[in-house]
Design a protein with these regions (language model features):
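Active-site histidine-anchored catalytic micro-motif
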Residues: 15, 26, 31-137, 142
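Short glycine-rich loop/turn motifs that provide flexible caps or phosphate-binding loops at active sites
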Residues: 6, 66, 92-93, 207, ...
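Generic secondary-structure signature for well-ordered alpha-helical cores
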Residues: 1, 9, 54-58, 77-81, ...
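Short hydrophobic/aromatic-rich motifs at helix boundaries and adjacent loops
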Residues: 18-23, 88-90, 156-160
């Protein structure tokens, strides 16, 4: 069993923004999931991050945030000694060519806590970014969703029901062939980085403008002399990604 720790319940410097209209009240609407059988751990999630990075050998821990970067930024602010101990951060967030999905300029995860994202991107830790540019290439089409359901397992059925729920919103909003699978791109990159390609560029987060708050300003073309601080992924082999995902779901 994997222990679960509750982290921060609000952004570092602004009111919380949520997205029930996309993923439902639970964030996982669609399947009829059982209630969790394992309670939350007593320790705060930020303290768990700090303690783990201090306990394990430096350069052996990769952080994989799939939401706002509040917990990591808070840990970095509380215990700056852990920053050089992080091997890498692989995150789902941001956008460049795909522009925003919560505002015209900003992707949701970064927009929720732009102050935290700014801290993380300026930390000096090696960062790999899975932006909307690449997650919108990983579309759950009807055929791909049928492949999940055809596994004939509780996991395959639950995933198919979940992506069915997302698909209705995403197809209506974007006019695409299916729903983008955002978060699994991070895990897929850990297993098969060869499925992805991108550029080492400078990425900074807008924190001062009301109009473009939370925008990931990505110097894709290298038009500034700002130092590179992130591998910004721009392409995924979508067929290879879904083959990998279906194979791994079949093992559960």
């Amino acid at each position: 069993d994997v222990p679960v720790f509750a982290g921060c319940d609000r952004p570092m410097g602004r009111a919380l923004v949520t997205a029930e209209h996309v993923h439902g009240e639970t964030g996982l609407n669609g399947p009829d999931l059982p209630d969790p059988s394992m309670p939350l751990q007593d320790r705060h999630g930020v303290d768990y991050i700090i303690d783990t990075l201090r306990r394990e050998p430096a350069g052996t821990i990769t952080l994989c945030p799939l939401g706002p970067l509040t917990n990591i930024a808070t840990a970095f602010e509380k215990a700056p000694d852990i920053i050089p101990r992080v091997q890498e951060i692989i995150l789902m967030g941001g956008a460049y060519f795909a522009v925003g999905n919560i505002t015209p300029a900003a992707e949701f995860n970064i927009y929720v806590d732009p102050q935290a994202a700014d801290i993380v991107f300026k930390s000096g830790v090696p960062i790999t970014v899975m932006p909307l540019d690449v997650t919108h290439q990983a579309l759950v089409t009807r055929a791909r969703n049928d492949a999940f359901r055809a596994l004939g397992t509780p996991v395959g059925t639950a995933v198919a029901q979940m992506t069915d729920f997302f698909e209705r919103f995403d197809k209506a909003k974007y006019g695409s062939e299916g729903a983008p699978l955002h978060d699994p791109c991070v895990t897929a990159y850990l297993i098969r980085p060869d499925l992805f390609s991108g550029r080492h560029i400078n990425v900074e987060v807008e924190t001062g403008s009301e109009l473009t708050l939370g925008m990931t300003v990505a110097d894709w073309w290298g038009v500034t002399d700002r130092p590179t601080n992130a591998l910004f992924i721009g392409h995924v082999d979508a067929d290879g990604f879904f083959d990998l995902l279906t194979d791994r779901l079949a093992r559960l």
